[in-house]
């Protein structure tokens, strides 16, 4: 994979907390698919949509945050491109199951660093969108 892109909902000026409302899902998609080691992010805001490029050591991932009804991801390779729909129909059921498991076992569903990582990523994204400059993402917690 030499590059990737995806779209997902997100509004910088959402009354529900801005990009943090849906952005956590996007950050989890990024860290699940490409790993937690995002170095930095650049963002552009046009007509209310945020387009961000998340920089890894050997990969750039473009995310279009826009209020659309379908979500897709694309992986770009040297010889082919793979495009796939992102199905979020079971996301709340999966999250609730992890929550219940955590309550029953009295253990967090993920290590604290994993739970905090989307917040670190979104903090940098909001900074980049507001300043128009590249923002560095805090290193993952161990």
Task: Label the model's feature ranges.
Residues 1-3:
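Rossmann-like NAD(P)H-binding beta-loop-alpha module
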Residues 5-70, 113-120:
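Rossmann-like dinucleotide-binding domain that binds NAD(P)(H)
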Residues 8-10, 77-79, 103:
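Short, histidine-centered active-site or binding-site loop motifs used for metal coordination
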Residues 14-20, 83-87, 109:
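A short glycine-threonine-serine/GTX helix/turn-capping micro-motif
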Residues 26-27, 93-97, 122:
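A general structural signal for well-ordered alpha-helical segments in protein cores
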Residues 31, 100-101:
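Solvent-exposed, non-membrane alpha-helical residues enriched in polar/charged side chains
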Residues 47-99:
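C-terminal substrate-binding/catalytic lobe of Rossmann-fold NAD(P)-dependent oxidoreductases
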Residues 102-142:
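C-terminal helix-rich "cap/oligomerization" subdomain common to oxidoreductases
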């Amino acid at each position: 994979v030499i590059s990737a892109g995806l779209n997902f909902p997100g509004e910088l000026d959402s009354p529900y907390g801005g990009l943090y409302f849906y952005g956590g899902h996007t950050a989890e998609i990024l860290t699940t698919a490409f790993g937690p080691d995002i170095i930095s992010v650049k963002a552009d805001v046009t007509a209310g949509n945020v387009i961000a490029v998340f920089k890894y050591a050997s990969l750039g991932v473009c995310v279009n945050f826009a209020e659309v009804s379908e979500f897709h991801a694309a992986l770009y390779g040297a010889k082919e491109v793979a495009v796939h729909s992102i199905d979020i129909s079971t996301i709340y059921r999966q999250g609730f199951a992890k929550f219940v498991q955590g309550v029953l076992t009295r253990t967090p569903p993920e290590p604290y660093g994993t739970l905090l990582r989307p917040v670190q990523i979104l903090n940098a994204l909001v900074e980049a969108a507001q300043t128009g400059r590249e923002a560095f993402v805090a290193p993952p917690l161990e």
